[in-house]
């Protein structure tokens, strides 16, 4: 095969032959000590933030609805334990625009055992002993001896009750729409508001709409949560299947690398082809169904995502996307057919290396465990930080009042000057906040939590990359395998990485984290400016997002290769990054031909596993296989477990294939150095395998006869 020679512009001097070099250097010192110390200080600060958040936060604010006194409805061990639902005295006041600003209706709210199920006014209920007994379930205490007028003026009871249903632990009027568009509540289109006025049921719509706008998304979240509770067992089975397929694939790749790569290529084409066929059949079958020709634009956003599967345009979009992917893959395979042979040789060599370092296959489990700890710590800290505010009470009034929306204290509000100047006003719970130093810098603590999450997650990933790189480099540079390799390559490499190079790992992950935080901020700004019509701003923001996306990919590439050089030579991060970059630039053509084609083949492997498990999950959860029709759980959205299984399968496959990818990258960098250090002579023989020598049209010259 034709030799692949890369151009060698001025990117530093090629590596010179060193007879003492035997692979990863053992006599090394600590690198990037300043960054190591800074990282440790930041971790200690992160622990302090967590302790502070846990001491101030209260997750009950997320779980339970809160009444006008700031008490939690339905909380165990409190007087409100048996009253889990929140009841609004006058739901129509929720039509105020203030609801959208402060997420709070300007009406009294109290915890109740169950929602009202009948029409009733205080005036009529007061005259009937049984009715008034029922009515008092929705009133405050202290009604004895008071007249109807006194009760209403004191705000102890609502003027009326309407039939309601619980929704996200809140009582909302049981509105219904009959044929012709007539709105009813409790089968009535008119009702008495308790103040002598006959109101239309449509008047309740605005209040309910505004009251639910803040929690509308929670309906979807709650349904998704219910789906998870119904399907978690089957999701785990799907993920276990993905893990077993990934493990089987890796084992087969170890012994049958060449055959498995070609089988993988053919299978990917067939799986995507089947996807196109299935989508086409669905598209044709919907032709005769009424309403299936509605466009996605006309349909708009629907919380019930299964609606989209009854639209022909959805399946047409799937067909187009899959067809494009199929064509792109086939074209790449045609144009890269010769390069694929070289990449297969590199994968075979990686398989051989993994055969000597079998423990590397299980290292992703260690990385996964560390990442789980990081994610769990971040999530718990975020919840406690977001719930560490104190209840804030504000003045609410139906009429004009100078003190409206001002902060008040419910304990002494009845005797305050605010109440005297605004007799109709009420001091109600508004939201959670605070004026202390802690609350003033709360947003800073939340930002610190997010930033340290990115930094720690990237550090864990970097540790895995350097550990695997050190283990596989010790394999490559061993003259006699496995005699010249450490007894436990993974543990030896992990120990070196933590003992000497924590600073370098922290430095590289810090750079990447800063870029990721900037990308998050750009996404946040983009979300806030969605309504703007300034095209220049949109264009600038789009350019910045694109540039930082490219920069993140570049930094990940540099970091990955820098960690390999640190693992081998034990130099600091910047020097290693420069050496790796120059080495790759001196061999640009080989990088494009070998490394990237190999990455493409490994990506096809991940795609195959995701496709197989995804197809199985689709037919199971959608109930399209009669054998499993009664076994599959009944779900609101069957795409929830399908999507979870697909994403989880990709992450699992990525975890297993990341070992191969890191092995390939390490061997690739090592054999580039091998080509520069050695020339194949008896004094300077190549250390790469005979298979790679043959692919690259290189050979070691025999020792001269004596």
UniProtKB/Swiss-Prot annotation:
Segments in the Cytoplasmic topological domain: 1-32, 254-256, 337-364, 478-504, 621-638
GO BP term (any one): ethanolamine transport
Keywords: Antiport, Cell membrane, Glycoprotein, Membrane, Mitochondrion, Mitochondrion outer membrane, Phosphoprotein, Transmembrane, Transmembrane helix, Transport
One GO molecular-function entry: choline transmembrane transporter activity
Source organism, top-level taxon: Eukaryota
Carbohydrate attachment residues: 187, 210, 293, 397, 412
PANTHER family: CHOLINE TRANSPORTER-LIKE (SLC FAMILY 44), CHOLINE TRANSPORTER-LIKE PROTEIN 2
Function: Choline/H+ antiporter, mainly in mitochodria. Also acts as a low-affinity ethanolamine/H+ antiporter, regulating the supply of extracellular ethanolamine (Etn) for the CDP-Etn pathway, redistribute intracellular Etn and balance the CDP-Cho and CDP-Etn arms of the Kennedy pathway.
Family: Belongs to the CTL (choline transporter-like) family.
UniProt name for this protein: Choline transporter-like protein 2
Species, as recorded: Salmo salar (Atlantic salmon)
